Amino acid sequence: LPGLVDDAGRVVLSVVIPEWSGADIGAQLRQAFGCPVSVDNGVRLAAVAEHHLGVAQLVDDVIYLSVGNRISMGLILGGRPRRGIHNAAGDIGRLAFRGLNTETGQISWRTAPTAAEVFAAARAGDRAAQDELDAFIEELAHGIATLTMTVDPAMIVIGGGLSAAHEQLLDPLRQALPRHLGLPFQVPLAEARLGGEAAAHGAVVHAFQRHAADIYGIDDMPVPPITPLPHDTASPTPEETK
């Protein structure tokens, strides 16, 4: 789900779907299906998926950044998702990237209505679009550097609708980040592996961790192997279809 989601599955606040703020989605699903239900923030679940099944399986401290219509973060610290006392850990889009976002957290573009149009114009040689894209990358790198110095992760994973733009986003971002960090070491920056199905895969892991003990009667039962869907069969995220 988009927004702050508490342990019971209630949406505390959602700027993406304001009408859901205060809705007890978890209770509604439990009543509808008559079984235990676990609900969480979608970007946090995507981070869980990349840690268990994706590109970050070998590290336990991960910043997962979803870059699409908005910028959101999921944190894995010590091998576990970091929720925070108010379940707000990672809700940093409007703070760490203030120069990129509107009040609703949506990325604002000047030279075209959508990111796809800005990227296409830049590829076609439009100087204004390329300048805007360069400024976007520098602002993104600065925000990531701030988060990196706060968390000191072993890996940064970029997901969301813009993550597949290697030559226009990921490669320039890899070049810009060391300038903003100024550190004698580099933090690996990788593209998310699970695409639009990352949150769904993370939900499977999350549900197993929450309910396996009730089902099997075994505490701390490890998550069994899960075979991710091939990347080319993953359905697009809402960020990619807008």
Identify the meaning behind each predicted range.
Residues 1-58, 69, 76:
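Mid-protein regulatory/catalytic core that forms ligand/cofactor-binding pockets
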Residues 6-8, 27, 31-35, 52-53, ...:
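ATP-binding/phosphotransfer module of carbohydrate and carboxylate kinases, centering on a glycine-rich
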Residues 13, 63, 190:
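Conserved Rossmann-like nucleotide-binding pocket used by diverse enzymes
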Residues 19-23, 86-89, 112:
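Short, conserved loop/turn and helix-capping segments at secondary-structure boundaries
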Residues 41, 67-69, 160-161, 189:
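Short secondary-structure boundary segments
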Residues 42-44, 86, 194:
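Residues that form or immediately flank small-molecule/cofactor binding pockets and catalytic motifs
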Residues 58-109:
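Glycine-rich phosphate-binding loop of actin/hexokinase-like ATP-binding domains
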